[in-house]
């Protein structure tokens, strides 16, 4: 539904511009077709494009050239970042500690300069241990070694890892 709402606004703008004598020959509907990060079920490209084209035709704009940019839907789930666990920093439970002091940190050799989306957009990325361990999983914030408070890859992730292990993001 958000795509259709955005399309309606775009078509209103096109109509306003053309009412002033400026012809519009094509519509670029942008990109960002959804991909699955956790349990989301984005609409298929066929369903989304079908709904958009139906709305474009219904609003009398079917004669225009329509462009789409598939964005991350083409490659978003195609890559994996592998990183080594450099250090495990257990949290403390002392009264009066600053915020976050009770957290456990898994410090890895990948950083926000390797994968910017979590730091910049709070994007959720799956993180799994590459070694199978019988250890009880611990909840960690997975962070990089850059001296910057925003250098994190995942918050509150349950992992059974040790120093020297590898994770896949």
Which residues does each PLM region occupy?
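Active-site loop/helix belt of alpha/beta enzymes
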Residues: 1-89, 153, 158-159
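Charged (often Lys/Glu-rich) extended helix/loop segments that serve as interaction or gating elements
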Residues: 51, 62-169
């Amino acid at each position: 539904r958000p795509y259709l709402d955005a399309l309606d606004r775009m078509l209103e703008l096109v109509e306003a511009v053309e009412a002033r004598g400026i012809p519009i020959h094509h519509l670029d509907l942008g990109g960002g077709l959804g991909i699955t990060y956790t349990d989301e079920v984005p609409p298929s490209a066929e369903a989304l494009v079908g709904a958009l084209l139906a709305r474009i035709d219904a609003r009398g704009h079917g004669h225009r050239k329509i462009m789409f940019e598939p964005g991350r839907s083409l490659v978003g789930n195609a890559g994996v970042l592998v990183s080594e666990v450099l250090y495990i920093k257990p949290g403390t439970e002392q009264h009066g500690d600053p915020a976050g002091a009770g957290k456990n940190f898994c410090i890895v050799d990948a950083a926000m300069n390797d994968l910017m989306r979590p730091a910049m957009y709070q994007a959720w990325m799956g993180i799994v241990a590459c070694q199978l361990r019988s250890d009880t999983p611990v909840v960690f914030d997975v962070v990089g070694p850059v001296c910057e408070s925003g250098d994190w890859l995942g918050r509150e992730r349950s992992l059974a890892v040790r120093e020297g292990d590898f994770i896949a993001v």
